[in-house]
């Protein structure tokens, strides 16, 4: 199933996701280059809420640009298989080798504002990230390594500790708390199903 259909079929968790889903779909339909950074206004990105097998730890990286502990992920850069991008980004940004989807379904949707910043010596204007998030499960015994051009630390936190570690208030209140709520709900539903 293509990503447009996946997003069309996605059932929003709250008003934020409902409104952001509409904007993401509008952009997917309006722009041919939304999967690349050539679209300087808005482009597709992917994030991962990475948990361990017990769902009691969350993997975060200390993001160089945002100067904060943050979820893992990156730009689609022309790739429309966003789950594959999420898995690749987690491996690249953390060094974790054993990572898999908890589900192949989209876990969350967000439209994220990105302030103008310097990247590799060039100014990047403010823009939007049309973000798809996946819930991934990783082996928390794997060695962790930083990706110096993107982060300066990688660490496992308790779910609530991951929220507290972020210095980005908006992310804590609107994204990370939501992801923890959804993760706990996902775990309860799967326990009831005997998975």
Model feature map: region roles:
Residues 167-195:
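Charged phosphate-binding loop/patch that engages nucleotide di/tri-phosphates or the phosphate backbone
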Residues 36-71:
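N-terminal strand-loop-strand
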């Amino acid at each position: 199933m293509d990503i447009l259909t996946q997003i069309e079929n996605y059932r929003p968790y709250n008003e934020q996701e409902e409104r952001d889903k509409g904007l993401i779909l509008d952009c997917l339909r309006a722009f041919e280059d939304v999967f690349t950074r050539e679209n300087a206004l808005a482009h597709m990105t992917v994030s991962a809420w990475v948990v361990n097998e017990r769902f009691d730890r969350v993997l975060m990286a200390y993001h160089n640009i945002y100067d904060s502990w943050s979820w893992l992920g990156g730009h689609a850069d022309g790739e429309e298989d966003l789950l594959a991008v999420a898995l690749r980004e987690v491996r690249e940004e953390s060094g974790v080798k054993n990572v898999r989807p908890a589900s192949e379904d989209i876990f969350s949707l967000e439209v994220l504002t990105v302030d103008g910043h310097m990247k590799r010596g060039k100014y990047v204007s403010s823009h939007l990230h049309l973000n798809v998030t996946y819930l991934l499960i990783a082996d928390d015994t794997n060695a962790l390594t930083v990706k110096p051009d993107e982060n300066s630390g990688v660490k496992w936190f308790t779910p609530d500790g991951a929220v507290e570690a972020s210095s980005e208030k908006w992310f804590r209140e609107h994204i990370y708390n939501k992801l923890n709520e959804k993760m706990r709900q996902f775990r309860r539903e799967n326990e009831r199903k005997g998975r």
